[in-house]
Amino acid sequence: MKRAFLSALSVGLAALFLTGPAQAQGNPGPLRIEITEGVIEPLPIAVPPFLAETPAASQFARDIAQVVADDLEGSGLFRAIPENAFISPITSFDSPVQYADWKAINAQALVTGSVSVASDGRLVVKFRLFDVFSDAPLGKGLQFVASQSSWRRMGHKVADAVYSRITGEGGYFDSRVVFVSETGPKNARQKRLAIMDYDGANVQFLTDSSAIVLAPRFSPTGDRVLYTSYATGRPQITLLDVNSVRSQGLGSAQGGEMSFAPRFSPDGRSVVFSLTNGGNSDIYRRDLSSGAQTRLTATPAIETAPSFSPDGRQIVFESDRSGSQQLYVMSATGGEARRISFGPGRYGTPVWSPRGDLIAFTKQNQGRFHIGVMRTDGSEERLLTSSFLDESPTWSPNGRVIMFTRETSGAGGAPSLYSVDISGRNLRRVPTPGAASDPAWSPLLP
């Protein structure tokens, strides 16, 4: 862990820089968490309840501050100091910070904020971040303006800004997750697409339970979702508009063909997927505008689960062409593939990190399932989890956290969503209303 100055960050939701007495004054605070070195002791941070500047903002002020504290603590990098430990309350957003009182309770960072309801009914949220031990603000304050229904997003935006200033990396709190919501007995599950905030709040269903759905994936802009649907009786790739909740089959499968495991290209213009015909599965690429389809692999093996590199030049996929299920990387235009997994066991469901540096995967070995990561050349393999059944990894927008499905054993076993950071620490269950599987993390919301 280091202490180093970070400059102010500009973010959306009608964000404005604040000016005033607490603005950065040329005395930069050197507070910083260096994530790559591994964080064992979370950084103590104080997030007092935000001040309500208008009577109607009272509950929003407390709730938004709680979202900020929960986001930061949930990352595993911070430890929120309980409110009953505070020595001096924050009574004015513009009053000078009493650094000695925060040092006395070992707070290394302090987040202050205020909330008001404007004449047009919108919420106005202001916040500042302070490096307590340097007696200085960390960058300029920010102000967000949005509808009252967006109050949780405003909390996530504040938390993302704090995370970014202290770690030097992008946040991931203002994002959503699409997943498969499951109900019913294990041998007759009903499956629906659902979407929620990254932390399990605001669950909404995108499909009904009339057809089984699998493997949803967000578009790069987060406004569309690809998934596999059994509405026609056989698996078919379907494209859903998140805002209108309208879906359409991409219609590539014919006769006895089955198409599944779709994923967008980084530019959102094409899709890679598996197509099975006559018992042989290969990987194809489809242009979404023209419908033109290109076969990328042509072997007798089962080849599936393709995932683009962030630059769109390569594809990682799973194949049993060597006799067991392993991971391969090939050009995005097809051609010769190189094997990158060589450890014991079987590897599957590879997903390229949005940072481009790692590939997440599922591994089965000696009766256990694992979520792991490796370099894109297959080196430095690390297993992050181990259980009866862990599968379906998906990356947070900043490439620092992986969400996945964990299913318990036995007749009553059911899947749940979990997250873990890429060091293998901070394993957490993501709350969902019922059984849930196949998570897919969106990019940061605009």
From Swiss-Prot:
It is found in: Periplasm. Belongs to the TolB family. One of its GO terms (cellular component) is periplasmic space. Keywords: Cell cycle, Cell division, Periplasm, Signal. It comes from the Bacteria. Gene3D superfamilies: TolB, C-terminal domain, TolB, N-terminal domain. The Tol-Pal system is composed of five core proteins: the inner membrane proteins TolA, TolQ and TolR, the periplasmic protein TolB and the outer membrane protein Pal. They form a network linking the inner and outer membranes and the peptidoglycan layer. This is Tol-Pal system protein TolB. It holds the Pfam family TolB_N. Its main location: periplasm. It comes from Dinoroseobacter shibae (strain DSM 16493 / NCIMB 14021 / DFL 12). GO terms for biological process: cell division; protein import. InterPro entries: 6-blade_b-propeller_TolB-like, PD40, Tol-Pal_TolB, TolB_N. Part of the Tol-Pal system, which plays a role in outer membrane invagination during cell division and is important for maintaining outer membrane integrity. HAMAP family: TolB (MF_00671). SUPFAM superfamilies: TolB, N-terminal domain, Tricorn protease N-terminal domain. Transmembrane segments: none annotated. Residues 1-24 form the signal peptide.
